[in-house]
Amino acid sequence: MQNLTVAILAGGKSSRMGQNKALLPLGTMKIIEHLVTNLRPIASELLLVANTDEYAFLNLPVYRDRFPGQGPLAGIETALRVAFNEKVYITACDLPLLPAEIPRFLAENTEDYDVTVLAYKGKIEPLIGIYRKSIYPVVEKHLILRKNKIIDFYPQVKVKIINFEQLPENLQREEFLLNVNTPADYEKLLKIFSLKE
């Protein structure tokens, strides 16, 4: 898509997995490579936010957090600060099955909202969302105040929530939202992936 930055946040500690989940194998590639492959077609700019040099093999720009240790909101701050485009799709490195059509749908339906996020079963998914670069000062201020929860800044901006059921029917598959946080999640991912192949 024209004028869309895609930012993959890969700065987490992967503590529940015991190793870097983004680098776990999935078929012939690593999890993070699947994300990059899926999202590249919709990105006019593609970048990673990570505090490690382990992703050099992807040949993508990698930016480090300005507020290390302050969670995913710090990753959003970095992405908004460095992004070339006004619209920035923020996602996590542990959503390898999410098709690019979902962020494309969100981006096409942002209207004049500052944040457009997906919600599933009543729960907001802040790392499946389009964020406008113009809200950067609000995000930065929250981090300076050590208010690290993403949705805590939502009341200060215009937020549009798109429910899972509002997506086109072919995108309403629960497996697309599988977060790979634990060894059990990884086993589930491998099963789903082997069925797809």
From Swiss-Prot:
Localization per record: Cytoplasm
Cited InterPro entries: MobA-like_NTP_Trfase, Molybde_CF_guanTrfase, Nucleotide-diphossugar_trans
Name of the top EC class for this enzyme: transferase
Entry GO CC: cytoplasm
GO BP, sorted A to Z: Mo-molybdopterin cofactor biosynthetic process
GO molecular-function term, one example from the UniProt record: molybdenum cofactor guanylyltransferase activity
List of residues binding Mg(2+): D94
The enzyme's E.C. designation: 2.7.7.77
Classification via CDD domains: MobA (cd02503)
Catalytic activity annotation: Mo-molybdopterin + GTP + H(+) = Mo-molybdopterin guanine dinucleotide + diphosphate
Keywords assigned: Cytoplasm, GTP-binding, Magnesium, Metal-binding, Molybdenum cofactor biosynthesis, Nucleotide-binding, Transferase
SUPFAM superfamilies: Nucleotide-diphospho-sugar transferases
Domain of life: Bacteria
Record keyword Magnesium present: yes
Cofactor: Mg(2+)
Binding positions (GTP): L9, A10, G11, K21, D65, D94
HAMAP family: MobA
Similarity-based family: Belongs to the MobA family.
Job of this protein: Transfers a GMP moiety from GTP to Mo-molybdopterin (Mo-MPT) cofactor (Moco or molybdenum cofactor) to form Mo-molybdopterin guanine dinucleotide (Mo-MGD) cofactor.
Swiss-Prot/TrEMBL domain comment: The N-terminal domain determines nucleotide recognition and specific binding, while the C-terminal domain determines the specific binding to the target protein.
Protein name: Probable molybdenum cofactor guanylyltransferase
Organism: Carboxydothermus hydrogenoformans (strain ATCC BAA-161 / DSM 6008 / Z-2901)
Organism placement in taxonomy: Bacteria, Bacillati, Bacillota, Clostridia, Thermoanaerobacterales
Annotated gene: mobA
